Curated annotation (Swiss-Prot):
<protein>
    <recommendedName>
        <fullName>UPF0473 protein SMU_2077c</fullName>
    </recommendedName>
</protein>
<dbReference type="Pfam" id="PF06949">
    <property type="entry name" value="DUF1292"/>
</dbReference>
<comment type="similarity">
    <text>Belongs to the UPF0473 family.</text>
</comment>
<dbReference type="InterPro" id="IPR009711">
    <property type="entry name" value="UPF0473"/>
</dbReference>
Length: 99
């Protein structure tokens, strides 16, 4: 399992069910192909600042690369995917410790 983070964040636009677009920064990507057959991405709203408690909203998604090597569509991670959430939390905590 590996993760990738850089000082300059990539941006991604997510579109909700109503067609509203929201810009996000890619905080962290996680290679989970070996263990779970897919990759993961952690996103934060672009320009978001911490709230009064020092918290910031982070969203996690999985994705599987398309056959042509391009990244596929983002998929929500099921709430009951305990092993995946544990792995994501462990990698995220390591990421925080590095910063």
């Amino acid at each position: 399992m590996s993760h990738n983070h850089e000082q300059e964040h990539d941006l991604i636009t997510l579109v909700d069910e109503q067609g509203n677009e929201t810009l996000f920064e890619v905080l962290l990507t996680i290679d989970g192909k070996e263990e779970f057959g897919k990759n993961y991405v952690l996103l934060v709203p672009a320009g978001a600042e911490e709230d009064a408690d020092g918290q910031i909203e982070i969203q996690a998604y999985s994705f599987t690369e398309n056959e042509d090597g391009t990244e596929g569509a983002l998929q929500p991670i099921p709430e009951d995917a305990d092993a995946e959430w544990i792995m994501i939390e462990e990698v995220f905590n390591s990421f925080l410790d590095e910063d």
